[in-house]
From Swiss-Prot:
The protein's name: D-alanine--D-alanine ligase
Highest taxon of source: Bacteria
Membrane-crossing segments per the record: none
Organism per entry: Pseudomonas fluorescens (strain Pf0-1)
Pathway: Cell wall biogenesis; peptidoglycan biosynthesis
């Protein structure tokens, strides 16, 4: 552990967190990942002595929240219904403190188009893009942006529904496929160069991780299944570029109102410029996940990490107006 990260450790006695509901599963396309993340978090909290129990979130969640004795909630739902502000809203109505970002920041970060609009307004570099609603939009985007491009559902995570395309026909096919996940589909310039992911914890930026994969990009298989994905930490940047990346990450997260914890995904082009893609407000916590890797580099093991995330919910008590 370096002195820079010494204040990340929770100083709260495990029993003082009260009864903690770990919210996982849900109904989104990322349900299976959330189940793995949730079980890992629940096991770590219970091993630390926290009075924690799990809720696999379903249609009865409002009734569960109102009928159970819950002192605070650890949100480890991925995707819609968990990262989009809706669960945060339910918890605020129920008067239950929770981990992570607030309603507005969660909704903004879940919406890739709105995220890009905020960043563009504030001068945070993000790839050029277009919204696809028709085949005509695909042709127009191809002319304006050129190839290759990457197609993304606007409200999905874990790279679900994403595809790299190199022709108009591929773009149209990818738009149709992405439309099965989301009514709003984006297409972005493809940035040639290395990819980085940078976690934040309690308003501090953790050591960046460089990603390497034989896949076309860091897709669902590379994230959760493959054993050939490469992670470099230290990330290989020189000190000045690493500081630039970490400073930009802090600005990008602050622009969206990210609180508690999160993870930004960034590309670097051939000229060394960084391009911000998105921020995850409840990132994965599986054995393949990136936030635990970054936390380990900062000196926190998995149990210490989940306690630090939970402690941030205490930091936010009574400060809901300051949350995003």
């Amino acid at each position: 552990m370096t002195a820079a990260y010494a204040n990340l450790f929770s100083t709260i006695a495990p029993k003082d967190f009260g009864r903690v509901a770990v919210l996982f599963g849900g109904l989104s396309a990322e349900r299976e990942v959330s189940l793995k993340s949730g079980n890992a978090v629940l096991t770590a909290l219970q091993s630390a002595g926290v009075d924690a129990f799990g809720i696999d979130v379903g249609a009865d969640i409002l009734q569960r929240l109102l009928s159970e004795k819950i002192d605070r909630a650890f949100i480890i739902l991925h995707g819609r219904g968990g990262e989009d502000g809706s669960m945060q809203g339910l918890l605020e109505v129920a008067g239950i403190p929770y981990t992570g970002s607030g309603i507005l920041a969660s909704a903004l970060a879940m919406d890739k188009l709105r995220t890009k609009q905020v960043w563009h307004t504030l001068g945070i570099p993000t790839p050029r893009h277009a919204v696809l609603r028709s085949e005509a939009d695909c042709i127009s985007a191809a002319t304006e942006l050129g190839f290759p491009l990457i197609v993304k559902p606007a409200h999905e995570g874990s790279s679900i529904g994403m595809a790299k395309v190199s022709s108009a026909s591929e773009l149209i096919d990818a738009w149709k496929a992405a439309s099965t996940y989301d009514s709003q589909v984006l297409v972005e310039q493809w940035i040639h160069g290395p990819e980085f992911t940078i976690a934040t914890l309690r308003d501090q930026v953790l050591p960046p991780i460089a990603l390497g994969t034989p896949h076309t990009f860091y897709d669902y298989d590379a994230k959760y299944i493959a054993n050939d994905t490469q992670y470099r930490i230290p990330c290989g940047l020189d000190a000045a570029k690493e500081k630039e990346l970490m400073d930009l990450t802090a600005q990008a997260c602050e622009a969206l109102g990210i609180a508690g914890w999160g993870r930004a995904d960034v590309m670097q082009d051939a000229d060394g410029k960084f391009w911000f893609l998105e921020v995850n407000t409840a990132p994965g916590m599986t054995d393949h996940s990136l936030v635990p890797m970054a936390a380990k580099a900062a000196g926190l093991d998995f149990q210490q990490l989940v306690l630090a995330i939970l402690a941030a919910s205490v930091d936010a008590d009574g400060k809901k107006e300051a949350r995003g």
